[in-house]
Amino acid sequence: MKKSCALVLSFCLLLGAASVPAFAWGAATHAYIAGKLGKIWPLMNANERYGIMAADLFNYDFQYYFNSTVKLYTHGGPGAEGFMGVWANARWWGYQKSLAFGFVAHNEVWGCDYTAHVRGLTYGQGVGYVVAKATELMPDLAALLGSHGFSLDDPVLLEVCHNLVEAAGDILILRADPTIGEKIISACLLRSNDFPGLLASAMGPAWKDAVIAAEKEFRRTMILYGAALTQGQEPAVKAFAEHLAQLGVELIKFLGGPDIPLDLAKGLAESGIRQALNLCRSDYLPEVNATVSFVKANLAAHGVWY
């Protein structure tokens, strides 16, 4: 118990020392999906896992929050699939295709994030599974905030609930695969050094330094995130709540909301994660598994195979 508490404390302190907020929004879920989609060979699958997580590498620096170029090359949008440049530029030798396979699988046009944020398969049809669950969580979180004299505009409240649902989803993935934390760590440690250059080659020379800096911080954060998951559900919930509170306070201010005290935010975050766990307990894995089949078919249809 003391060992677990010490590791969780270290996780929170190290993340809190980062220059910008950093939190993995559904990284374990993406890593789990990559394990179902990709190759059985360990080094290939480790790079696929890293690639699928790394599409979110810019998410943790608010200066890129509304950046259309970042969205185009990491997640895409209707009729805009800049992320495919990573696949097109990846060489067949080494692990570049493994990285690119995972990276492209993440996209929001026909990849993993489509079912989370656009159109769910088993739940949340028309809005996306995560968006649907976040919307359901909003009244409870609004009531909790209101009991302390705070309120958020609906778009900001939805964004906060979205992050709570994704954190809860990763806890449910941990229940399904107790080794997911180790798999995230190994993906970060074994990832090919080609990744930053591969993404920069798609985004263009002007983005090279930004990609290198963001990827360095992202990789460090993912190692810590995986370490928190290795400690089991309760320590992970507390670690996630600790840092989601830090992220949430800054995100709410960034989006024009009130300055919520950090101590209050910690309690709200933990309560929100636990409520989200109850909302997602029965149908999260069915949606994730349906997403695996959906993405596998779409990868083949778009010529993404190796």
Describe the residue ranges of each PLM region.
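Positively charged n-region of N-terminal signal peptides that target proteins for export
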Residues: 1-8
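N-terminal leader/auxiliary helical segments
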Residues: 12-306
